[in-house]
């Protein structure tokens, strides 16, 4: 059989040296489909080569011929450039073979055999190098092909480490522990060989203001933030008719609740320009009031208002809320169904204080300290209940403009939601252009709105936040809804908290007055002079004046331990309010100037706080 395959020779012993080295012999061996026969023929030829004393030359020639055949099948071998599917530029690859089958190199074994070592089983290449404008961190955009081209941006340190590069598989590459080293080397070679042709760009991890420009309304800057936030970044876009949006929304703005939601949305990019702080606008009330749809209308200023895009449910942690706010930076944060995120203790105080600080806490990884994230945006929330409680701290109360929806925000919710899902994003760019062109006037206008609110009983923080909403509303009205009257002080006054409503000491004292009123038996004996149950103190009443102007002053001696306990159960701290109580006369000091009185109440000696009611 061997003789038949190798020509007319009967045995391998009759093969001459020229015939042994001929292309026909090599071809007939390699074309044999049966591996057993192919190996047998090759071994017979090697034995004949030994007899002719040319074994080494035969072996070299045979493997050279085999490699030459492989080269024909491997498009790109020896050319030093990529032959990837269309859609990406051709790059230099050096000794790497880069084609539709992936990226690999050919390694020759000591026995002369050659094997393919794959860095990637799919086409992959660096398509851009980036430097983050805020941090200076170098990043690389990788493009990879799996039925179609995909791209993702990674820190350069990630693609430079055998262990870290495996993380790129989360985004679709085929990096694994087996090929990691080769893939790192291939990408490093590509970056070195193509340093003068790969585009170098500036990147940023957030939206909003940057060096006087507003992302994403700026060309030439790429978003390099976490991939989880890419849908939000991409949602800042346009769809549908600008004119139809203005006409439709003009009618909706006759509702004061929607007007305030849109005013807060317009105010968000103004905050850093006018020196204002982040604030919360919270609309609450029963279901089917149209609060969520109103939120969508307010976010349609900037882009796609659908849930999961510019609007999101609050099924997220406080930390996630802060990192999302840092990514938005100056674009408003819109969160629906706030009650989902309620703290275990039953309040939202931590959320409010965290988002209104505008700075995320520092965090440290094992190898580096994370960048301190900041934001300066408005937070638009909706829910079924108030965001603050009677026991909420003054800081939380102060930072929230909280509005109970006693009527509907949107009358036809389904129709309106459908409309803004198909018409959105046009107003944002024009609004930012106006801000840039009129930057010098903004602080003056802001000051004017603050002055219009000075006659209203409210705290400074409430006044400053509402003035920002009024400024945003006024600019929005003039740009998109000409002829519309801007919000006035009378329009917004019902939604501002008075100083007393914000003052935690005043709220705590009112609470204790109610406790005393419904627990009179804890302070007073019955008609027989007996006390039953726990004794909390005593009440001394002083009556003065004449008819009809008789007045009664009640002095309540309240057991210190019980007072602290009752306040704490309601969410107040005695130590936080005692100084204010003493200052305004609600609490009387003893003759030594101390807050506590050592006295007897119904025969029981103890330490008491004297409250004037």
Regions found by a protein language model. Name each.
Residues 11-13, 33-256, 323-324, 328, ...:
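Conserved glycine-centered beta->alpha loop in an early N-terminal alpha/beta scaffold
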Residues 33-37, 42, 67-82, 198-252, ...:
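DNA transaction DNA-binding modules
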Residues 220-307:
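P-loop NTPase catalytic core of nucleic-acid-dependent motor ATPases
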Residues 294-345:
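AAA+/P-loop NTPase substrate/partner-engagement loops
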Residues 326, 364-381, 396:
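AAA+/SF3 P-loop NTPase mechanochemical coupling elements
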Residues 337, 376-386, 404-407:
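A short beta-strand-to-loop transition that corresponds to the Sensor-1 phosphate-sensing loop
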Residues 349-363:
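Conserved catalytic/switch belt of AAA+ P-loop NTPases
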Residues 373-375, 391-485, 489:
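Phosphate-sensing "switch" segment of ASCE/P-loop ATPases
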């Amino acid at each position: 059989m061997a003789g038949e395959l190798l020509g007319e020779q009967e045995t391998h012993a009759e093969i001459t040296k020229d015939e042994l080295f001929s292309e026909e012999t090599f071809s007939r061996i390699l074309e044999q489909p049966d591996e057993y026969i192919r190996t047998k023929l090759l071994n017979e030829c090697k034995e004949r080569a030994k007899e002719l004393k040319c074994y080494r030359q035969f072996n070299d020639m045979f493997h050279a011929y085999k490699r030459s055949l492989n080269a024909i099948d491997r498009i790109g071998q020896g050319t030093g450039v990529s032959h990837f599917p269309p859609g990406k530029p051709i790059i230099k690859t050096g000794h790497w073979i880069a084609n539709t089958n992936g990226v690999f190199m050919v390694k020759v074994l000591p026995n002369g055999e050659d094997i393919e070592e794959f860095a990637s089983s799919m086409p992959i290449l660096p398509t851009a190098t980036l430097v983050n404008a805020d941090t200076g961190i170098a990043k690389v955009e990788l493009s990879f092909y799996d039925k179609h081209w995909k791209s993702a941006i990674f820190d350069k340190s990630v693609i430079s480490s055998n262990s870290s590069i495996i993380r790129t598989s989360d985004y679709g590459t085929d990096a694994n522990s087996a090929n990691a080293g080769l893939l790192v080397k291939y990408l490093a070679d590509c970056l070195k060989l193509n340093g003068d042709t790969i585009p170098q760009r500036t990147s940023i991890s957030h939206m909003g203001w940057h060096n006087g420009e507003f992302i994403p309304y700026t060309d030439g800057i790429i978003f390099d933030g976490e991939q989880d936030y890419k849908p939000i970044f991409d949602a800042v876009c346009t769809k549908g008719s600008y004119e139809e949006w203005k006409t439709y929304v003009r009618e909706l703005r006759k509702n004061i609740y929607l007007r305030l939601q849109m005013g807060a949305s317009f105010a968000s990019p103004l905050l850093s320009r006018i020196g204002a702080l982040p604030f919360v606008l919270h609309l609450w009330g029963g279901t089917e009031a149209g609060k969520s749809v109103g939120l969508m209308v307010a976010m349609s200023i900037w882009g796609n208002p659908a849930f999961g895009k510019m609007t999101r449910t609050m099924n997220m942690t406080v930390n996630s809320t802060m990192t999302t706010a840092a990514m938005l930076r100056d674009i408003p944060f819109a969160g629906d169904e706030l009650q989902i995120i309620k703290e275990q203790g039953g309040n939202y105080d931590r959320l409010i204080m965290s988002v209104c600080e505008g700075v995320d806490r520092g965090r440290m990884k094992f190898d580096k300290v994370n960048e301190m994230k900041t934001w300066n945006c408005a937070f638009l929330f909706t829910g079924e209940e108030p965001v603050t409680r009677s026991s909420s701290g003054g800081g939380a109360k102060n930072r929230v403009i909280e509005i109970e929806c006693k009527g509907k925000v949107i009358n036809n919710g389904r129709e309106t939601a459908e409309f803004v899902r198909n018409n959105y994003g046009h107003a944002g760019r024009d609004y930012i252009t106006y801000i840039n062109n009129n930057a010098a006037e903004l602080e003056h206008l802001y000051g004017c709105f603050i002055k219009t609110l000075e006659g209203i009983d409210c705290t400074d923080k409430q006044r400053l936040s509402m003035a920002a909403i009024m400024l945003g509303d006024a600019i929005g009205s003039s740009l998109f809804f000409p002829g519309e009257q801007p919000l006035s002080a009378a329009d917004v006054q019902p939604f501002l908290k008075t100083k007393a409503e914000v003052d935690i000491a005043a709220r705590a004292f009112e609470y204790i007055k109610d406790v005393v009123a419904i627990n009179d038996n804890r302070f007073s004996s019955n008609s027989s002079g007996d006390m039953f149950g726990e004794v909390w103190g005593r009440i001394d009443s002083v009556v003065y004046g004449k008819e009809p102007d008789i007045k009664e002053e009640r002095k309540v001696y309240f057991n210190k331990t019980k007072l602290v306990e009752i306040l704490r159960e309601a969410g107040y701290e005695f130590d936080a309010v005692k100084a204010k109580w003493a200052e305004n006369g609600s609490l009387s000091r003893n003759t030594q100037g101390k807050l506590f009185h050592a006295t007897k109440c119904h025969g029981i000696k103890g330490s008491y706080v004297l409250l004037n009611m």
